[in-house]
Amino acid sequence: MAPAAGPRTGKHAKPPRSKTLKRKRGQDELSSLIQRVEDLDLKETFKSFSDLPLSEPTASGLASSHYKTLTDIQSRAISHALKGRDVLGAAKTGSGKTLAFLVPVLENLYRKQWAEHDGLGALILSPTRELAIQIFEVLRKIGRYHTFSAGLVIGGKSLKEEQERLGRMNILVCTPGRMLQHLDQTALFDTYNLQMLVLDEADRILDLGFQQTVDAIIGHLPKERQTLLFSATQTKKVSDLARLSLQDPEYVAVHETASSATPSKLQQHYVITPLPQKLDILWSFIRSNLKSKTMVFLSSGKQVRFVYESFRHLQPGIPLMHLHGRQKQGGRLDIVTRFSQSKHCVLFSTDVAARGLDFPAVDWVIQLDCPEDADTYIHRVGRTARYEREGRAVLFLDPSEEEGMLKRLEQKKVPIEKINIKANKQQSIKDQLQNMCFKDPELKYLGQKAFISYVKSVYIQKDKEIFKLKELKLDEFAASLGLPGAPRIKFIKGDDTKQRKNAPRAAAHLLSDDDDSDEEDGEKKSKKKEEPQVRTKYDRMFERRNQDVLAEHYSKLINDDGTMVAPNAGAGADADEDDDFLSVKRRFDAGDKDLGSSSDEDDESEKGDKKDVKVVHIDGSTPLVIDSKRREKLLKSKKKLLKFKGKGTKLVYDDEGNPHELYELEDEEQFKARGDAKDQQAKFLAEEVERTRMADMEDKEIAKQKRREKKEKRKARERELLAEAEEEETLVQLPPYEGDQDVDGGFSASEDEAPRPSKKPKVKFTEANDREEAEPWYKKSKKPSDKAANAPPQVQTLEDLESLATGLLG
C-alpha cells in the first residue's frame, strides 16, 4: 500500500505557516505602498527616486541601472502619473522623458497585482522602430525584478511568431502600423482590460502621417484608461486631446519659462549656402573634422543614398554610414548599434533618427536640408548636447529660406547665430561627381532620383514663406550633383495651365492637341472627376470626340462668342439661323471665263483657311515644322527625329578628372601665342623624330626578345630529342649463339669481359589498342613454326639474359 499522505518532515521541511506569513507580509507592503501613494503631495519637490513611493522591485531595478537622481520632468510627471492622472509632458531633448513614463507603468500595474492571465495592461506607442527598441531596452533594465511579461512589436519581424506570444504579454512597446495589424488580424489578442496608454513623441504620432492608424488603434481601446503623452514639442490642440479621450489632463512643461527651447550647452549656428554649393561645403566640413562624431540630416532617403555612395567613392578618411526608412530592420538596427559604439564616424540619415534616439557623444549635427518647421529642427539638434553635455549644430540655409526660417525659430525661442565659411577651406567636388556619374550609371541614376526627391520635398511643404521652389537654382543644383542636365519633373508647370485656360480657342488648339477650348476643357475636367474608375466600351464610345478634319474645321467656323461664321455675313450672324446654315460658296456657269481659274482674293482666302503651322524646336538647330498629319507623325518616331537634333559631343576625362572634348582645336590667337610657325614646325619635327626613335628602340627590343625566346625553344627541343636517342641506345642485344663454350660449359673469356650496361635499360610498354591494331584479322596457328623455334630468343632486360644463361648451362 502507498504511504499515507501527510506533512513533509526532515531537514528541508518548511514551517507550516511560512507561505501564509509571506503572503500576508506582501499584502501589508502593498497596502502600505498604496497608502503612501494616496498621501503623496503633488506640490512637493522630489530630488531622488528614493523620495518617491516606489515598490521594492522598481527601486532595485533603478538602483541596479544606476538611476538615482531625478530630472525636472521626472520629478513633476511621475508623481502625477502615480496618482492615476492623465499627463501631457513636455521637456527639452535629452532630459529623461523615457523614465518619466516607464516608472509609472511598472508601479501602477504592480499595485493592481497584474498577472499574465489579466491580459494587456500597458501599451506604449513609438513613431519609429529604433525608438521603440530603445524604450524596450530601458524597460528591461529597470523592470528586471518584476514578474511582468513585456514584448516588442515592430515591423520587419515575423508576424506569425508575434501572434503566438502576443496574448500572454502584459506590457507592449510597439509602432502604430504593426500594432494596428495585430489588432485587426490576431484573434487571441484583446485590449479590453487595458489600464495605461503611453504615446512617446506624441506630436509626431498625432500628426497627419499617423492619423488614420492612431484613430483605428484608439477605436480598439477602452475609454476608461490612463493616458500619458510625452514629447519635446508637445501638442495642445483640442482636437488631438479629444481624440484620445483625455480626462482633465495635467500639463507638465518644465522648460516653458526657459529662455531657450534647446539645451543650454548646445551651440547653434547657421550658414547661408546656395543650393549648388551644399555638397562642396559638406565635403569640406567632413574633411576638416575627421576626429569627431557627426550626424547629417537630409530630407529624403534617395538623397541619403546618393550622398553616402558618392562620398564613399571619394574616401574622406572617416567611416561613413547611412540610415533611412527603406532599409530592412536588421540592417537598421546594426547601423544604429555601430554608430552608437563608434568614436569617429559620419551618419547620413533622414528624420527616422531625428526623434528620441540616444546616441552617445555626438559632436556635430548638420542639417543639410532645411527642416519643415521649427519643431523638426529642435528634435534634430536634440541628438547632441544630451544630459548636460556640450554639442554643436549647423543649419544650411539657401538665401531664399533664411528670412522665413529665422522667423519660425525666433517664435520657438531658439537662439541661433550666423557664421561664414572660409574660402581657403572650401573644396569643390563637382568635377569628381561628374566623372563618377559618367563612369557609373547606377550612381547617375541615384543622382537623378535624389534631385527629384529633393524638389518634391520642397514642393509639398506647407510653409511657402520658407520654401520657395521658383527661387531655387535647380539647373545649377543638378550640375553640382554631377548630372548632365536637370531631370524633368512632371508637377513643375508654372502658370502654363492658367494661360492655356484663358487663351482663345485657336491659340489653345495650336498649343496642345488635347485642349481644344476653354468650355470643353472645363467640361472634360469635370467629367474626369465624376466618372468612375471602371469605364466600359460604351462609355468610351459616347465620350469619343471627333479629332479629325471636322473638329478643326468646326473650331474655325465658331467664333469666341459661340456664333457661326457665314461666308456672306459678318461675324455677328446668329449660329441658329437656317438661311446661313447651308450656303453655296461659289457658282460657275458653263463657258464662264473664270472657270478653272482663281483670283488673288481666292488665293488669299485659301491661304487664310489653311491650317496654322506649328513649329517644334528640338535640341538641334533645325526646327520641325508641322504642317500636315504626316509631319505630325514624325514626333512619334525617335529615329526620324535624329536628323532634326544636333550632333552629340563626346567628353573624355584626364587623369585628374577634368572633362575635355574629344577633339580640341586651337584658334588663330592661341596658335600665334605659342610662337612663330617655323619654330613650331621645327619643334614638332624634332618631337616626332624623338618619338619615332623611341618607338623604333622599343620595336627592336621586342624583336630581340622574340628571337631569344625562339632560340631557347629550339635548344630545349634539341635537348629532348638527344635524351630520347640516348635512351634508345641503352637497349642490350646479344649476338646469335655459335657454340663458343669452354669445357666446363661456361661462357668464353670474351663474354666475361663484355662491358655491362651503365644503367638499367628502359622497358617500353605498348597500349592494348596498339596491340590489337598490330594483330592481323586472321587467326594464327598455336603450333610454332620451325623457323620461330630455331630463332634466337630476344634479350631485352637483365632478367632475360640470366634466364638465357641458365638454359645454356643446364
UniProtKB/Swiss-Prot annotation:
InterPro entries named in the record: DEAD/DEAH_box_helicase_dom, Helicase_ATP-bd, Helicase_C-like, P-loop_NTPase, RNA-helicase_DEAD-box_CS, RNA_helicase_DEAD_Q_motif, SPB4-like_CTE
Any one Pfam family match given in the protein's UniProt record, by short name: DEAD
Subunit structure: Interacts with the U3 and U14 snoRNAs. Associates with pre-ribosomal complexes.
EC code(s) of this entry: 3.6.4.13
Top-level division of the source organism's lineage: Eukaryota
This protein's name: ATP-dependent RNA helicase dbp4
Keywords: ATP-binding, Helicase, Hydrolase, Nucleotide-binding, Nucleus, Ribosome biogenesis, RNA-binding, rRNA processing
Location of the motif DEAD box: 200-203
Catalysis performed (reactions): ATP + H2O = ADP + phosphate + H(+)
Statement: the UniProt record of this protein carries the keyword Membrane: no
Chain positions of motif Q motif: 47-75
GO MF annotation list: ATP binding; ATP hydrolysis activity; identical protein binding; RNA binding; RNA helicase activity
